[in-house]
Amino acid sequence: MHIVTLTYKVPNDEVDRHLEAHMAWLKEGYAAGTFLAAGRRVPRTGGMIFAAGGRDELAAMIKRDPFNVNGVADYTIAQVNITSTADGLEKLKG
């Protein structure tokens, strides 16, 4: 599993201009089975995406994110080997 951290490089009003397209991109990731969960960081300085699959596939998807294409955010990818979970979250292991 990977945790993607987005850090905004622009003011939130600029982020908001690209938010609808970013949300559509997230939906594509969910439909593909790559994205498991996502949300905004608090305070609103960026976001996080929990993702399954390979790092190369994920990096290719990030290149297509409207936030990336339009210079809205920087990204880091951390790989995590989940070894234990609460009931119902076994999909995160591996």
Identify what each model region corresponds to.
Residues M1-G94:
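Conserved, structured core segments of small domains
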